[in-house]
UniProtKB/Swiss-Prot annotation:
Its cofactor is Mg(2+). This is GTPase Obg. InterPro entries: G_OBG (IPR031167), GTP-bd (IPR006073), GTP-bd_Obg/CgtA (IPR014100), GTP-bd_prot_GTP1/OBG_C_sf (IPR036346), GTP1-OBG_CS (IPR006074), GTP1_OBG_dom (IPR006169), GTP1_OBG_dom_sf (IPR036726), OBG_GTPase (IPR045086). Residues 451-468 have a biased composition (Basic and acidic residues). It comes from Mycobacterium tuberculosis (strain ATCC 25618 / H37Rv). The gene is obg. Its EC number is 3.6.5.-. One of its GO terms (biological process) is ribosome biogenesis. Keywords: Cell membrane, Cytoplasm, GTP-binding, Hydrolase, Magnesium, Membrane, Metal-binding, Nucleotide-binding, Phosphoprotein. GTP binds at residues 166-173, 191-195, 212-215, 292-295, 321-323.
Amino acid sequence: MPRFVDRVVIHTRAGSGGNGCASVHREKFKPLGGPDGGNGGRGGSIVFVVDPQVHTLLDFHFRPHLTAASGKHGMGNNRDGAAGADLEVKVPEGTVVLDENGRLLADLVGAGTRFEAAAGGRGGLGNAALASRVRKAPGFALLGEKGQSRDLTLELKTVADVGLVGFPSAGKSSLVSAISAAKPKIADYPFTTLVPNLGVVSAGEHAFTVADVPGLIPGASRGRGLGLDFLRHIERCAVLVHVVDCATAEPGRDPISDIDALETELACYTPTLQGDAALGDLAARPRAVVLNKIDVPEARELAEFVRDDIAQRGWPVFCVSTATRENLQPLIFGLSQMISDYNAARPVAVPRRPVIRPIPVDDSGFTVEPDGHGGFVVSGARPERWIDQTNFDNDEAVGYLADRLARLGVEEELLRLGARSGCAVTIGEMTFDWEPQTPAGEPVAMSGRGTDPRLDSNKRVGAAERKAARSRRREHGDG
């Protein structure tokens, strides 16, 4: 069973809004109480929240489907439905959210950072909210909108100050275990490290984190070996350290060629974040070189031989042995100083304020195009939303939809394009036979659907009239 997962594809479905209620107020001595249907509750959204106690995306590996609660339906007596609860999902710090096309949606850094992955649908209006001066007793209500549904890719990019890179079996895991309390798996065969290992290193009053990235080989930036899957974990590292095995017996390898090969792979790799968080490109990050395994006599000689050549590149060079712990303290304090210098030299990242992007107010645009089969297709945010809100089992609701489309100008545009009575018109997922409200060329008269003529009448039978009527019925019965 995998213990560390740093890339998953998940399926999110926010809650749908509740349906509005169509009801009439019923109360003693109030025969015409009017509409009192409540609105439906909004659907729950799916929100990612950064939790420092979460370190992997393993939970999403086994449960990739996330569904939020839907809103409750409205009820009579002007009672609105309850809103669906938001589904808050905990993710590790450093999680990057990508859409289906690979576009970056969010870079979640910092405890408590939130991102709305899928928005809940709006609740439908009840007939009380639909009542107006000309529509005093609507016999229908609007349906709730569907919640947002989409597939997302989550990638975890480790947050560490120092990233250790090197060929397999260079001693990176041994170095992490020697300078920190981390206990990574260590063995004498290549690719022992299959997941990044993090360790916290203390340097006097300061502390920093070190990430051990699985071994790289030539072509890692193009997907060879394990490098492409784990190179993303060094994107956030402030300092990159080349760990070189000076005791290797492989032909054609030496410290200089190993460093050049690693630099080639780093130069070919394109980070997803593109210098976000003010870290800059990988090529601009400070470097250090660790010549490892100098406890072997031949390795010590080789390290001393190439040390000056590497130092000419302007990189600090440390000759260490994780087996005997030789020169580990100079390495620890040297890396701590490099991190401090780099952080002091780079510009201070200005905290980004949360950006609220409201739903566009002007969504009245629409297009009408022939479908090639004698029908027409109407596209537009507002008409498609109205279709989803309409209960087609209610004739009055369908009439209300026709009025809304006519006011928007859809009927006029269909007539202009030569639409005839009975032709197929598709809006969203609904296809129906179109019937114009008025003949072509005549103005569209907006009817007050949902009106009740009894509400406009003041003719009510009083107590005296009812008493007289009872007397007449008695007399008629006696006769």
